[in-house]
Amino acid sequence: MVSRFLLTEYRNLTENPSEHFKVSVNENNLTEWDVILKGPSDTFYEGGLFKAKITFPPNYPYEPPKLTFTSEMWHPNIYPDGRLCISILHTDNVEERGMTWSPAQKIETVLLSVISLFNEPNTDSPANVDAAKSYRKLMHKEDLESYPMEVKKTVKKSLDECSAEDIEYFKNAVFNVPAIPSDAYEDEHEDEEMEDGTYILTYDDEDEEEEDDEMDDE
């Protein structure tokens, strides 16, 4: 049963790729996925491509998967060994703030929640105490440099560890992004929204092709 659930979710994610993450599966073990999470814009993590592994239990989706970062991370809710502490991956038997796991959850929801956590950490029960202390000092304007500096180190290291293929994936691919507000691209990408709801993230060759298509239509 677990294979059927995972195959369906994996197919949905690959047929409708996200600009925020990339997933791939271990061909020899469907219960192990590799994922790359893109650091969200306008945060200290912007520009980073952070690698992680998702491990699914035998009774998934009734038990949550586990997500462990393989990239070096500096975040209050990520243990130094890469294990992630987030409410959505806990059952209701664990006292955690926020939404907990249910069999109705989708991996896409989990990954978007992780990305959201980058900029909204929970410092009440931190997994990385030093990162939490540094973040609190940042929030209280006691130290505006230490936390951003440590995060930027991980951003650079994540890119050094990424393949050129993965970097190009996030740079050049076409994605369906229905959840993004229509005005999210109004400055830099105002003219790049397509009729089917996709966005092209680089425009050199594509713009020329669109112009040629318009001329052909005329």
From Swiss-Prot:
Cofactor(s), names only, from the UniProt record: Mg(2+)
Active site: C85
Gene3D superfamilies: Ubiquitin Conjugating Enzyme
A GO CC term assigned to this protein in UniProt: host cell nucleus
EC number(s) stated in the UniProt entry for this protein: 2.3.2.23
UniProt entry tagged with the keyword Transferase: yes
Domain UBC core: 1-160
Induction conditions: Expressed in the early phase of the viral replicative cycle.
A GO biological-process term: protein ubiquitination
Location within or outside the cell: Host cytoplasm; Host nucleus
Taxonomic superkingdom: Viruses
UniProt keyword annotations, A-Z: ATP-binding, Early protein, Host cytoplasm, Host nucleus, Late protein, Nucleotide-binding, Transferase, Ubl conjugation pathway
Major localisation: host cell
Function of the molecule: Accepts ubiquitin from the E1 complex and catalyzes its covalent attachment to other proteins. Performs the second step in the ubiquitination reaction that targets specifically a protein for degradation via the proteasome. By controlling the ubiquitination status of specific host proteins, the virus may target them to degradation and thereby optimize the viral replication. May be implicated in the shutoff of protein synthesis through its interactions with components of the host translation machinery.
PANTHER family reported in the protein's UniProt record: UBIQUITIN-CONJUGATING ENZYME E2
Protein name according to UniProt: Ubiquitin-conjugating enzyme E2
Taxonomic placement: Viruses, Varidnaviria, Bamfordvirae, Nucleocytoviricota, Pokkesviricetes
